[in-house]
Every structure is written in structure tokens, then in C-alpha cells.
């Protein structure tokens, strides 16, 4: 849910007024940590659904979450198939995949929320929730993503081959930071809402399966 600030910028309503510090979502989250007097976790955030409603991530408490920024026109878009396979195979054991479309990487998610929903349904028969389009980097980054990045900065480096070379040449300022590097970055969240691990875009859903199985059987 959003509320207007003094400068007209829309602010996440879960932040009290004194936590709204001028367009820095990560800092806002840290201020909110102190104000509420307890550690923040992923369940403390609300997100916007594709039809404009608000969903409280606390609804997923007790489930293992895999949070992914997705895109419809990316070379990694076929990962939807693997994500859906994970979701179908493990949802009855407590897994919930959550997709967040983003157009910040090569403008590879240009469609409306309705068009994205149609694409996911017709192209990959996606049954896990795909939310409204968000920014994941920059001053307008969704507060959930500011939190995820701060909790798991990632290990992105030369070992990621062609993707590293692409990011290093096109967005060199992102190297060595907690920024999301490309579409299909994945965050694993435990049933208590804590960030366990970040997987860079080229790590496939199938490569994550062992980690999911271990957490779901713990």
C-alpha cells in the first residue's frame, strides 16, 4: 500500500513518516528496523498484485519462498519452465515461487501487467503468482528488493562468464555492488522470512533444487 509523502512521491505505507528518508529504499528499511525495535524479514513487506491489489507477504509465513525478478523477452526467459516445475513439484511440501517482472535490464519486460500475465499463462502455463512490475535497482526500487539486496549482496564475478562480461561492459558501475545484475536473479527465503541465499541469473532452477529439498525436509 502506498501513501503520498510531502513531495508527492509515493511511499510504502508500512514505513512510519519518520522512516521516509528521501528516496533511498535501503536506508528507509534500515530506519524502519530501528523504529519497530525488531529485526525485519521478508514477511514485513507488502507488494502490489498485477490487478492492483496489495498482498502482505506475511501470508506466506511458514513456507519456503523463491523470489525471482522475471522478464518476457530475455534469453533467460525459458527459466520460467524450470521455475514452474519446481513450484508444481514442491508446493505441497511448502515451496512458494513469487515472480516480480522488471523492465530495468535491456527493456526486456516492456508489456503491461495484463500482458505479462497473459504471456506467463499462455507461454509457460505459470501457476505461481507473478506480481505487478517493479524496479529492483535505483532510487525507485521496491522496498522488498532493497531489503533482499542488502541481506544477500551476491557473489557475482568473472566465474559467471558471458553474463559477467556483458554486465561489466554495459553497466560497469554495478560490479562489486549489491545491485541486481540481470533478469532471473533468485532469492531463497526460509519459513521465518529470513534471506538464506542469492542465486545469480544463470543459476538455473534445477540447480537450486537440492537446496530447496534440504530446506523443505529440515
Predicted regions and their residues:
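N-terminal "domain-start" segment that seeds a small globular fold
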Residues: 35-58, 78, 155
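Thiol-based oxidoreductase modules, predominantly thioredoxin-like and allied folds used
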Residues: 93-111, 127-138
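Short, acidic, Ser/Thr-enriched surface-loop or helix-capping motifs
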Residues: 7, 49, 190
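Non-catalytic, surface beta->alpha helical segment in thiol-disulfide oxidoreductase systems
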Residues: 197-217
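Conserved helix-turn-beta segment immediately C-terminal to the redox Cys motif
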Residues: 63-64, 72-73, 77-100, 120-124
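Thiol/selenol-based redox catalytic cores and closely related redox-interacting motifs
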Residues: 119-202
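Short loop/turn microsegments at loop-to-beta-strand junctions
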Residues: 42-43, 65, 183-185
Amino acid at each position: 500500500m502506498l501513501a503520498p509523502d510531502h513531495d508527492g512521491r509515493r511511499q510504502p505505507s508500512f514505513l512510519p513518516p519518520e522512516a521516509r528518508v528521501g528516496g533511498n529504499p535501503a536506508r528507509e528499511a534500515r530506519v524502519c528496523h530501528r523504529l519497530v525495535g525488531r529485526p525485519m524479514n521478508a514477511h514485513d513487506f507488502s507488494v502490489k498484485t498485477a490487478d492492483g491489489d496489495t498482498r502482505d507477504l506475511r501470508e506466506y509465513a511458514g513456507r519456503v519462498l523463491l523470489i525471482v525478478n522475471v522478464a518476457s523477452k530475455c534469453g533467460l526467459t525459458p527459466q520460467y519452465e524450470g521455475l514452474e516445475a519446481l513450484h508444481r513439484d514442491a508446493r505441497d511440501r511448502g515451496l512458494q515461487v513469487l515472480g516480480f517482472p522488471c523492465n530495468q535490464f535491456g527493456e526486456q519486460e516492456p508489456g503491461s501487467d495484463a500482458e505479462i500475465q497473459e504471456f506467463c499463462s499462455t507461454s509457460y502455463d505459470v501457476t505461481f503468482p507473478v506480481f505487478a512490475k517493479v524496479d529492483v535497482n535505483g532510487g525507485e526500487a521496491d522496498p522488498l528488493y532493497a531489503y533482499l539486496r542488502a541481506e544477500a549482496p551476491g557473489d557475482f564475478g568473472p566465474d559467471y562468464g558471458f553474463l559477467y562480461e556483458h554486465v561489466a561492459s554495459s553497466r560497469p558501475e554495478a560490479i562489486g555492488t549489491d545491485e541486481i545484475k540481470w533478469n532471473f536473479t533468485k532469492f531463497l527465503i526460509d519459513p521465518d522470512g529470513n534471506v538464506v541465499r542469492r542465486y545469480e541469473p544463470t543459476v538455473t532452477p534445477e540447480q537450486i533444487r537440492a537446496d530447496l529439498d534440504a530446506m523443505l525436509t529440515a
